[in-house]
Every structure is written in structure tokens, then in C-alpha cells.
Curated annotation (Swiss-Prot):
An annotated Gene Ontology molecular function: fatty acid elongase activity
Signal peptide residue numbers: 1-35
UniProt keyword annotation of Signal present: yes
GO BP: fatty acid biosynthetic process; response to light stimulus
Triggers of expression: Repressed by herbicides such as flufenacet and benfuresate. Up-regulated by osmotic stress and down-regulated by low temperature, salt and darkness.
Active site as annotated: 221, 300, 384, 388, 417, 421
Annotated tissue distribution: Expressed in siliques.
EC number(s) given by UniProt: 2.3.1.199
Lineage of the organism: Eukaryota, Viridiplantae, Streptophyta, Embryophyta, Tracheophyta
Membrane topology summary: Single-pass membrane protein
Name recorded for this polypeptide: 3-ketoacyl-CoA synthase 16
Catalytic activity: a very-long-chain acyl-CoA + malonyl-CoA + H(+) = a very-long-chain 3-oxoacyl-CoA + CO2 + CoA
Coiled coil stretches, renumbered: none
């Protein structure tokens, strides 16, 4: 777009954004002019009219009070994000690509991992080198020992350390008592022991016995937004309460020890991580809350077999359990994302972008079928983007298809580099990065978007209620000076 046309578009967007003010301005001027012409006699006549029509006046105020009451009772209750906390694993669990591959070779030499050829080792190493992950991501202790420890007890220890650590830090930062929590929602896709993870938190923090608790399983990397949406729904029913949302994934029990290439990819991408989020519907909490939840949009295309089967946990030909990623995954993800954007767009985009979309649609429909679809400028709707750090290719495609800048996807790339794919909690590490960089100001709008098995694409939209500073023990506070880093890898090699 050349410079003159760009200026025209900016001016048009400004007109559309302030259309109501511009429309009402002439009306207000006319009212002011007419009011200035009123005489003292006109005002006295109006006063006498009110004195002689008590019944009409009473009915007017009665209807006004009734309407106001009904509006206040039926309108959606605001949901505030008081604070959130991301888990930072201990430093001894850091594992570079070299350390990981050395350990894999030792495991293989010990006979615990019977890979058929060196080709699979080279495949894993290439995935690690090109994934966008850095050299300080965290691998569970049970996977850094010889022999590997993948039993239920060790897996439970990993998850307990993550969720308890995140929640404990959240309680310390907010000063909230565990007994104040009325709603608890926990999500973990592939690790769901009995008692549940939500029960672990109830027991550890002695949460009250009438708490409304949910434990979401098997819902993939997009489950963090699903958990937020579930908590939002419960907060519409239960007044003056707090909701605690916890998102995590277990790595220990999900290491794949077979020879299927489509199942080895997840070994290379997923790392330890988890987040705890405190929500509130109490009006008094607005003053100290960081954000207000504006929208949640959920899309599930599982009715289509290709969507349903593109990411599944299953046994390979040798009976070894892993998560298989099909070749249809990019196509399915693009289709599901498109539906989510089509649903979210009308809710958040300014009318100018809706107008451009409509014009392009008419041209394509009636004049030129080969014309490309109009891609809305989502930077007019959001200041910050938290795109699920599922992998470098995913972030690249989102940047390209949504016409984003490197700065727009910086939080996602740096989260992938520093922490790896932490599944449903990655969008919270990204938000923590934005806060740590001091970029979050009052009124800023944030788009969190995550994709996961099923196949699902879910979005949440927040607005900052103040200039947000990073909370104590922000996961980036010890390494922020290193970021952003330059990531230059040729994926075509």
C-alpha cells in the first residue's frame, strides 16, 4: 500500500472509530442552541407542568427504576483477572540440545530405547535444532536419570511441583486466602490420575468443602482458554467469589519410546510448565485487577474425521503409547483458525475493517472470483498477541497469515525459545513476557489464541485495566536482559 492510500485508510479508520461522537456532535450543538433561547417564562411553564402531573412523573421514574434493575440483574457480570503466576522450574532441570541427545544415546545404549537405526536419532536432533527451542528449557528429573523413571509416582511428583508451585506463588502475590476460592478449574490433557489434580490442590491448600471444582482432561494445548471460559460461566452464576484456574501438562509419563516418526516430534517440543490464574467477579477487585475478560471464542471441528484424527494419543505397531501427529495437521489447523477468526472478528474489529471485508466479499462474489479474501488488520483490534507457542512453524504461519510484525509475535517466539512448548500454559508465559518488558499500558487489548487436539481453536480477549507491572517471581525476571534473541534457522535445509 503506497503512502497516500495508507493515510486515507488511517483517516477512514479514525472516522469510523469516532462515528457516534461525530454523529451526536451536531445534535448536541442544536440542543445547546435551543436551550440558550429558552426564556424564564418557558422554564416556569415546564415547572408548573411537572407539578400538575404527579402520576405521569411517578410512573416515569417507576419504569426507569424497574428497567435499570432488570438491566443490572440480567447483564453479564464482569470477570477480572486479579493476577497470574507461571511456574519456574529449578535450574538443575535445564537441558540443552546436546545434553538431551547425549542422554538419549545413553538410554539407547542401555537397551531401554530400541530405536531401529541412527536415522531416527538424526531426525530427533534435526527437529531439536530447527524447533526454535533454546538451550535452557526444562526437562523433568525422571527423564534425566538412568534408567528413565516414568512411573505414576514420579509423574505425579512432577505435576504436583508445577501446580502447587504456581498456585503458592499466586496466593503470596495476591494475599488471597485459599478459603476465599469458590471455583477451581484445572486442565491437564494426558495426565489425569485418581484422585484428580483438582483434588490434589484442594487437599494441599485446604480449600473449602463447598468449592465448585472441575478437572478437564484430554482437551489438548487449547485447554487453557477452555478452562478460562468454564470459570467465566461459573462466575456468572456464583456471586462475589474467586475462581482459580490452573493449566499444565505432564512430560514424564508422555515420553514416547518407540520408532514412529510422527510420534517422536512431541518428544522434541514439549517441556515443563504450568500457570495459575486468579479470576474474580467482585466489583471491589476492579481497582487492583490487571485485566478484564472481554470475549472467549471456542471452535471445535471434531465432527470432521480429518480434524478428529490429526492429533491422537494411541499405540504404535509395537504397542508403545505416544501422541501421533498426522500430515493433515497444518491444513486442519488453518481451517479451524479461519473459523475462529471469522467468529471473533465481528466482535472486536472496528467497523472500518468490517466495511473493507464486505466490499471485498461483494467484489469477489460478483466481479472477480479469483480475488483473494480480505485479511482484516487485527492490529486495529489488539495491541498484544499471545499465540500458543506450539512450534516455530506455527508462529511463522500466524505471523504471515495475520500480517503481523516480528514485534507482534516476539512474546510467542521468546517463550518457545526459553521454555519450549508448555502446552496450555504457554499463552501465560507470553503474557508474563509482555508485562516484564513494560509494554502493557492501560486500555491495551490482548488476544490469546491456542490450538489443540480435537481439533480446537480457542481465543480469549482481555483489556488492561491499568499500566501493568510484572508480579513478584515473574518467570522472566532472571533472564529478561537476554531477550529478545535472534533466531535464525533455515527450515529448508
Amino acid at each position: 500500500m503506497d503512502y497516500p492510500m495508507k493515510k486515507v485508510k488511517i483517516f477512514f479508520n479514525y472516522l469510523m472509530a469516532h462515528r457516534f461522537k461525530l454523529c451526536f456532535l451536531p445534535l448536541m450543538v442544536a440542543i445547546a442552541v435551543e436551550a440558550s433561547r429558552l426564556s424564564t417564562q418557558d422554564l416556569q411553564n415546564f415547572y408548573l407542568y411537572l407539578q400538575n402531573n404527579h402520576t405521569s412523573l411517578t410512573m416515569f421514574f417507576l419504569y426507569l427504576a424497574l428497567g435499570s434493575t432488570l438491566y443490572l440483574m440480567t447483564r453479564p457480570k464482569p470477570v477480572y483477572l486479579v493476577d497470574f503466576s507461571c511456574y519456574l522450574p529449578p535450574s538443575h532441570l535445564k537441558a540443552s540440545t546436546q545434553r538431551i541427545m547425549q542422554h538419549v544415546r545413553l538410554v539407547r545404549e542401555a537397551g531401554a530405547w530400541k530405536q531401529e537405526s541412527d536415522y531416527l536419532m538424526d531426525f530427533c536432533e534435526k527437529i531439536l535444532e530447527r524447533s526454535g527451542l533454546g538451550q535452557e528449557t526444562y526437562v523433568p528429573e525422571g527423564l534425566q536419570t538412568l534408567p528413565l523413571q516414568q512411573n505414576l509416582a514420579v509423574s505425579r511428583i512432577e505435576t504436583e511441583e508445577v501446580i502447587i508451585g504456581a498456585v503458592d506463588n499466586l496466593f503470596r502475590n495476591t494475599g488471597i486466602s485459599p478459603s476465599d476460592i469458590g471455583i477451581l478449574v484445572v486442565n491437564s490433557s494426558t495426565f489425569n490420575p485418581t484422585p484428580s489434580l483438582s483434588s490434589i490442590l484442594v487437599n494441599k491448600f485446604k480449600l473449602r468443602d463447598n468449592i465448585k471444582s472441575l478437572n478437564l482432561g484430554g482437551m489438548g494445548c487449547s485447554a487453557g482458554v477452555i478452562a478460562i471460559d468454564a470459570a467465566k460461566s461459573l462466575l456468572q452464576v456464583h456471586r462475589n467469589t474467586y475462581a482459580l484456574v490452573v493449566s499444565t501438562e505432564n512430560i514424564t509419563q508422555n515420553l514416547y519410546m518407540g520408532n514412529n516418526k510422527s510420534m517422536l516430534v512431541t518428544n522434541c517440543l514439549f517441556r515443563i510448565g504450568g500457570a495459575a490464574i486468579l479470576l474474580s467477579n467482585r466489583s471491589i477487585d476492579r481497582k487492583r485487577a490487571k485485566y478484564e475478560l472481554v470475549h472467549t471464542v471456542r471452535v471445535h471441528t471434531g465432527a470432521d474425521d480429518r480434524s478428529y484424527e490429526c492429533a491422537t494419543q494411541e499405540e504404535d505397531e509395537d504397542g508403545i503409547v505416544g501422541v501421533s501427529l498426522s500430515k493433515n495437521l497444518p491444513m486442519v489447523a488453518a481451517r479451524t483458525l479461519k473459523i475462529n477468526i471469522a467468529t471473533l472478528g465481528p466482535l472486536v474489529l472496528p467497523i472500518s475493517e468490517k466495511f473493507h471485508f464486505f466490499v471485498r466479499f461483494v467484489k469477489k462474489k460478483f466481479l472477480n472470483p479469483k480475488l483473494k479474501h480480505y485479511i482484516p488488520d487485527f492490529k486495529l483490534a489488539f495491541e498484544h498477541f499471545c499465540i500458543h507457542a506450539g512450534g516455530r512453524a506455527l508462529i511463522d504461519e500466524m505471523e504471515k497469515n495475520l500480517h503481523l510484525t516480528p514485534l507482534d509475535v516476539e512474546a510467542s517466539r521468546m517463550t518457545l525459545h526459553r521454555f519450549g512448548n508448555t502446552s496450555s500454559s504457554s499463552i501465560w508465559y507470553e503474557l508474563a513476557y509482555t508485562e516484564a518488558k513494560g509494554r502493557m499500558t492501560k486500555g491495551d487489548r490482548i488476544w490469546q489464541i491456542a490450538l489443540g487436539s480435537g481439533f480446537k481453536c480457542n481465543s480469549s480477549v482481555w483489556v488492561a485495566l491499568r499500566n501493568v507491572k510484572p508480579s513478584t517471581n515473574n518467570p522472566w525476571e532472571q533472564c529478561l536482559h537476554k531477550y529478545p534473541v535472534e533466531i535464525d534457522i533455515d527450515l529448508k535445509e
